[in-house]
């Protein structure tokens, strides 16, 4: 009985076709994909946070402003900077991540709600070029790493014309360094390549 096939060849082919969900993804520069997405979907809603809504153009323009401010702080000598982002979940967190990717760098997410000891261990291990924080956040990082900390709000308030930084992110570069829970000891950084973000775009 186990060897009896309940479906004929046509039905097997139909099931196989219905479940063909693989998609060929382009090996593209993530920053360029972000820019193309913003142009294609400009006025459409990209981020909603509470009762606030931001279009793709709004988020892209803000990310370009932040990327420009970060570049001004780091200088042009460092092509792939490491930026720790310690921001609450909000539109500014999305903007910060996009800004770092546009800059050709990679980000290290830090949850401001996590214990200060965990955040200190991560910062000690990853040694970021900049720690992006909030003006309102009285964080231990500001006290421990005052020279590296930079508030995102002044960057967002900057006026002028800020275009795409045109920093290419190649497949062998890093996009993010995410730390494990550290349940077996110290948190360990897990590198993620830009290709892991392409399906989201």
Predicted regions and their residues:
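Short, intrinsically disordered, charge-balanced linker/junction segments flanking boundaries
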Residues: 197-201
């Amino acid at each position: 009985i186990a060897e009896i096939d309940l479906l004929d060849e046509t039905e097997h082919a139909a099931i196989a076709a219905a479940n063909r969900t693989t998609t060929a993804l382009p090996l593209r520069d993530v920053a360029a994909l972000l820019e193309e997405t913003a142009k294609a979907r400009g006025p459409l809603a990209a981020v909603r946070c509470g009762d606030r809504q931001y279009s793709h153009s709004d988020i892209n323009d803000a990310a370009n402003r932040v990327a420009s401010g970060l570049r001004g702080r780091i200088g042009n000598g460092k092509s792939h900077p490491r930026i720790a982002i310690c921001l609450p979940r909000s539109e500014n967190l999305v903007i910060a991540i996009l800004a770092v990717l546009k800059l050709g760098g990679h980000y290290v997410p830090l949850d401001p709600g996590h214990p200060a000891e965990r955040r200190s261990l991560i910062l000690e291990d990853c040694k970021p070029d900049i720690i992006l924080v909030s003006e309102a956040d009285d964080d231990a990082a500001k006290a421990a790493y005052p020279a590296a900390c930079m508030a995102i709000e002044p960057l967002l308030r900057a006026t002028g014309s800020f275009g795409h930084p045109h920093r290419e992110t190649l497949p062998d570069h890093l996009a993010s360094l995410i730390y494990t829970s550290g349940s077996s000891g110290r948190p360990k950084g897990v590198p993620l390549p830009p290709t892991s973000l392409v399906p989201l775009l």
